[in-house]
Regions:
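N-terminal "assembly arms/tails" that initiate or stabilize quaternary assembly
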Residues: 1-62
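Internal, well-folded beta-alpha domain core
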Residues: 93-269
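A glycine-rich, hydrophobic loop/mini-helix early in the fold
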Residues: 53-126
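Generic signal for short, ordered secondary-structure residues
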Residues: 16, 67-70, 90, 190, ...
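Proline-rich intrinsically disordered, low-complexity coils
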Residues: 6-7, 19, 28-32, 59, ...
């Protein structure tokens, strides 16, 4: 199976890996677009003011332009270690065992706006680019969705395994899921005291990170939707078909534990 994660706006600095080399990344069919986007981002960064405007950076984020300017020579680290934030804190890549890293390497991909789909262990540099960022201030310049969607969709269409999409909708549009059985977008819902379910906003990313971690620990070797749902039920997770005619799955968060300022979504009641 392949678990698809969104990236994060925040990223760790540094790294011990050698600079970006496209031939070391998964999904080689994406190399032409990767090369095009990286070149455009680096070129944009040569004009500081234009980059600040195009990337919608605030005064305290101006240093992100230098990050982008340095992409060709910057050190790299594994993708799951590069990204930070709520989802990645919950996934906690730093505590994965060697065996779990092997599972993640073959079963997890991150949807980067800069590099497209990358494997969990692919070496990536620090950068600043979002799915809705502009690569040029020129009128009519191609959006990232326009640049990535065809190649990204083809990369997923070539696969015949189970696809579990935990990306936000903006990033999912950069590589749309194929329209087939076994390709599922996951929506996170919360169950309130009355038993009703509703969209979960604040803890959405956290719940996705916890699910991704559980899948990695479980081996992420499910060959069908039924196998996945059976595993989830056995582990005490409520993962179910949306029942609305789509192929979406719903992940129900039964409760949030902790105290204000230190709350945590729980996937088990």
């Amino acid at each position: 199976m392949l678990i698809l994660l969104p990236p994060s706006e925040t990223k760790r600095d540094g790294g011990a890996g050698s600079p970006l080399a496209l031939d070391r990344l998964s999904f080689p069919s994406l190399h032409p677009v990767r090369r095009e986007v990286v070149e455009a981002v680096v070129e944009l960064a040569s004009d500081h003011e234009a980059a600040v405007r195009a990337l919608k950076l605030g005064p305290k984020q101006a240093g992100e332009v230098e990050r982008n300017r340095a992409i060709p020579s910057a050190p790299t680290m594994r993708a799951l270690e590069r990204y930070t934030g709520v989802l990645y804190d919950a996934l906690d890549a730093a505590s994965l065992s060697e065996a779990e890293w092997e599972v993640a390497s073959r079963s997890v991909a991150v949807q980067s706006a800069l590099l497209g789909l990358v494997g969990a262990a692919d070496p990536v540099p620090a950068y600043r680019l979002s799915f809705d960022s502009r690569l040029s201030l020129k009128r009519g310049a191609a959006s990232l969705k326009r640049r990535w969607s065809v190649a990204g969709a083809a990369a997923l269409r070539d696969r015949d395994d189970l696809l579990l999409d935990l990306r936000s909708e903006g990033y999912a549009a950069l590589a749309p899921l194929p329209d087939r059985d076994g390709a599922h977008y996951v929506r996170v819902l919360a169950r309130d005291e009355s038993g009703e379910v509703r969209a979960l906003n604040h803890f959405n990313k956290q719940a996705k990170g916890l699910l991704a971690r559980a899948l990695i620990e479980g081996g992420a070797a499910f060959g069908s939707t039924d196998e996945l749902l059976g595993w989830a039920a056995g582990e005490g997770y409520e993962l179910r078909p949306a029942g609305d005619g789509s192929r979406d799955l719903q992940l129900i968060v039964p409760e949030v534990r902790g105290v204000p300022g230190s709350l945590m979504a729980s996937l088990r009641a």
